[in-house]
Amino acid sequence: MTEQQARIVAFDDVPPNRRRGGDVRALLTPTTAGATSGFMGVAVVRPGERISEHYHPYSEEFVYVTAGAFEVDLDDVPHPLRTGQGLLIPKDVRHRFRNTGDVEARLVFHLGPLAPRPDLGHVDTEETDETAPAGVVS
């Protein structure tokens, strides 16, 4: 029997993170849910908005689009991604998401395994209006 408990976390329970563009909310994490092998969240991106380029040196990222349409750049190569499609982003692959439609777009993401420390899990490679200088690890 496991000591870990099931945990439900609502979208509105987590404050938005807008530092990289969009409204990104990490819902099920080590902090919010006691996760031990990865974390899951949701991103909401308005038309014309983007999530800035970054990569994950320790984790694969699994993405599923629940609404709208994106263009995702994978190491500078653009790929269309629409409602009902999933995407696997291998570790160390630079990626950014742009909402190419005229309605709000939403995606669910999961990253695993976890980095040794949270500050090592995400490397920014470009600035947005709300980010620190490029190359800052967060």
Swiss-Prot record:
The protein's matches in CDD domains, at most eight in alphabetical order, are given as: cupin_TcmJ-like
The Cupin type-2 domain sits at 42-108
Q: Which stretches does the entry tag as region Disordered? A: 118-138
**One Pfam family named in its UniProt record:** Cupin_2
Report the domain of life of the source organism. Bacteria
The record's comment on protein family reads: Belongs to the SchB/CurC family.
Protein name per its UniProtKB record:
Protein SchB
Q: Which organism is it from?
A: Streptomyces halstedii
Taxonomically, what lineage is the organism? Bacteria, Bacillati, Actinomycetota, Actinomycetes, Kitasatosporales
Its gene is schB
